[in-house]
UniProtKB/Swiss-Prot annotation:
The keyword NADP applies. This is Tropinone reductase 1. GO terms for biological process: tropane alkaloid biosynthetic process. It catalyses: tropine + NADP(+) = tropinone + NADPH + H(+). Pathway: Alkaloid biosynthesis; tropane alkaloid biosynthesis. It is an enzyme of class 1 (oxidoreductase). Pfam families: adh_short_C2. Belongs to the short-chain dehydrogenases/reductases (SDR) family. SDR65C subfamily. Catalyzes the stereospecific reduction of tropinone to tropine. It comes from Datura stramonium. The gene is TR1. Its EC number is 1.1.1.206. Homodimer.
Amino acid sequence: MEESKVSMMNCNNEGRWSLKGTTALVTGGSKGIGYAIVEELAGLGARVYTCSRNEKELDECLEIWREKGLNVEGSVCDLLSRTERDKLMQTVAHVFDGKLNILVNNAGVVIHKEAKDFTEKDYNIIMGTNFEAAYHLSQIAYPLLKASQNGNVIFLSSIAGFSALPSVSLYSASKGAINQMTKSLACEWAKDNIRVNSVAPGVILTPLVETAIKKNPHQKEEIDNFIVKTPMGRAGKPQEVSALIAFLCFPAASYITGQIIWADGGFTANGGF
């Protein structure tokens, strides 16, 4: 094969596996899986904007990313507030000149209680953060995603949206809703060249989970029960989730939409609980 043709093929291949020149908004990017997602996308060439409720944590992260040479900006946002969500998207539109390639609805909360003990406040926090905020952000991001001519929406679901897990009925309901929303938006927005997918992690060893395990023997027992039923025999790492999200955003994944992909070491394939 002629050298020029080989060079052209290599160039095209690199483009399929790169996020260079793209823009991304990642919610809840100051810790855990969100932090890994920000680093993953920025490391692959994307300009990333993120948000957090905690200003101190966010500022520390932004400084670390600057030192690493990553193109990341961010601001404080309480995603339970519709007004603050609107303000966030206005800022993103300004920073990225009205175009957004990637929206990762990562931010989420979980409260552990028996179903009979959940309060109205619990309901508002869980459904407001996990479902309403993600839905609304997708709505107001739609013009920016469409304008990019290559839009991607990624939702963070969970194995709890598929398997019945103990003491998280509201959380499970919010993730089940996310799964159905993924399919609906994927079909509705395909005509606008916007792909919509969900990633559903299993047990992931974030710093918060590791701290909880050390402080609470019951928490460690619950995690161990998950791992016993996981064919790969271990918990996952945040980077193993962020890598899957990056893949779904690559041009190489251009025919994948409407999917809920489990990143759980085989837990759901093995029947869950």
